[in-house]
Amino acid sequence: MDQQTAHEVRQTLIHADERYQAYTMDLEYMLRWEILRDGEFVQEGCSLSQESAREAVAHVLSHFRRQMLRRRTTAGKAKLRALLAIGTPSPEGRERRGERDI
């Protein structure tokens, strides 16, 4: 290969869903993989085979999904606590005001 001929790196799609896409690039001595979330770069890595690249991408995507679920759960709990604090009077407060159940 002479200096004027550049090595063309071909991207191969190895994963696609509604939010994530993952591609590998064959660099002859290894596969470089990268993950995009909503079209934006989020993670890259290297593997020695196509199979190990798929496994690595699956592992990283699993981690991202666990993070997303944890954030949703935490946010949901905070919202629920805020709603409960607003709408639930404590029994002690009712007794201090002289209110009783009938």
Curated annotation (Swiss-Prot):
Spell out the subunit comment.
The soluble methane monooxygenase (sMMO) consists of four components A/MMOH (composed of alpha/MmoX, beta/MmoY and gamma/MmoZ), B/MMOB (MmoB), C/MMOR (MmoC) and D/MMOD (MmoD).
Lineage runs:
Bacteria, Pseudomonadati, Pseudomonadota, Alphaproteobacteria, Hyphomicrobiales
**The UniProt record lists the keyword Oxidoreductase:** yes
Q: What is this protein called?
A: Methane monooxygenase component D
**Any GO MF annotation of the entry:** monooxygenase activity
Q: Which species does this protein come from?
A: Methylosinus trichosporium
Question: Does the record's keyword annotation contain Oxidoreductase?
Answer: yes
What keywords are annotated for this sequence in UniProt? Monooxygenase, Oxidoreductase
